[in-house]
């Protein structure tokens, strides 16, 4: 009788350890991709955004059916064609317009919108998607628009995973709905809004109230310590992973801001050699005149309290804004 050749230690390790481990990891990866419920993830993403807006002292975003429809259509489209904010494939069943304003109008939303989104090859939860957007400077500033008070979100898993948030102002929506009627009036002010994708002048006796308090972020607790460099366009295109950007923005019709000093410190001292972005130094020319950001040269420490200080002049007077935040704890030992 022919005897079989004994297996080598390498073959035994491959058969009894590495192959089962690989099968287990693949199975876990597969299950992690199918466990998501799109409606629940969309709601979780919007809830997470409202959590961050509340920590920043802003009003939460109420669900709006038209904005949700616009977000759903675009997320459906992105799950097949990952083109960002543009749509070029008119034959796609969910195509409703080339740009966010056209798509919002097609969904029945008359006012201007801000659209933010993530696209990935693998499914990410709505909460994780929102947290990622909040570390991306340009997206964050739009998500924290203080006059916005309604939104719609959608999460879709197709060839690609897409998460989309559309947000707007109920006050502007109502003014757009009355634009034709108000156009007959003789009024003191003329307010220009984006209505149904077109610039529209609306006569008003009184202008809507403006949010004049600066919006600061991060603020509060459980803050991600880093920015991964994946925002498009990238505000830090030549750097390795850096600190979660610290931003301050002044909204409304305000006098220009002159920056004197922007610092970030912890109990270990002031962060050295930060990158300060302003409208003048922003490599992508995305920042507005009264928007400012500070990037630490490397990720911030976990579970650490930081204090940001922004010293500036406005209308000939010097002011100081100071706020604190604490980074989150490590989630696992790989971090």
Language-model segments: which ranges?
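Acidic, low-complexity Ser/Thr/Gly/Pro-rich repeat segments typical of extracellular/periplasmic
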Residues: 226-229, 233-335
């Amino acid at each position: 009788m022919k005897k079989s050749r004994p297996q080598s230690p390498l073959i035994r390790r491959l058969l009894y350890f590495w192959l089962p481990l690989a099968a287990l990891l693949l199975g876990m990866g597969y299950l992690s991709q199918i466990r998501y419920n799109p409606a629940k993830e969309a709601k979780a993403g919007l809830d997470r955004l409202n959590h961050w807006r509340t920590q920043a002292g802003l009003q939460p975003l109420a669900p709006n059916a038209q904005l949700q429809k616009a977000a759903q259509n675009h997320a459906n489209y992105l799950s097949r064609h990952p083109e960002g904010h543009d749509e070029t494939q008119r034959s796609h069943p969910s195509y409703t317009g080339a740009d966010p304003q056209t798509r919002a109008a097609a969904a029945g939303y008359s006012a201007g919108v801000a659209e933010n989104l993530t696209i990935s090859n693998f499914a990410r939860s709505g909460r994780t998607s929102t947290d990622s957007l909040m570390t991306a400077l340009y997206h964050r500033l739009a998500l924290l628009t203080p006059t916005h008070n309604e939104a719609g979100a959608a999460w879709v898993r197709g060839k690609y995973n897409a998460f989309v948030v559309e947000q707007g102002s109920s006050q502007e929506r109502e003014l757009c709905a009355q634009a034709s009627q108000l156009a007959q009036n003789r009024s003191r002010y003329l307010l220009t809004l984006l209505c149904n994708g077109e610039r529209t002048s609306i006569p008003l006796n009184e202008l809507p109230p403006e949010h004049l308090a600066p919006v600061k972020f991060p603020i509060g607790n459980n803050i991600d310590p880093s920015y991964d460099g994946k925002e498009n366009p990238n505000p830090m295109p030549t750097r390795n992973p850096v600190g979660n950007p610290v931003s301050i923005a002044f909204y409304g019709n305000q006098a220009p801001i002159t920056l004197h000093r922007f610092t970030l410190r912890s109990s270990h001292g002031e962060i050295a050699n930060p990158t300060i972005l302003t409208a003048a130094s922003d490599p992508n020319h995305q920042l507005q005149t009264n928007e400012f950001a500070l990037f630490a040269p490397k990720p911030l420490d976990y579970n650490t309290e930081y204090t940001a200080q922004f010293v500036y002049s406005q209308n000939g007077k010097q002011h100081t804004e100071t706020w604190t935040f604490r980074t989150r704890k490590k989630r696992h030992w790989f971090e």
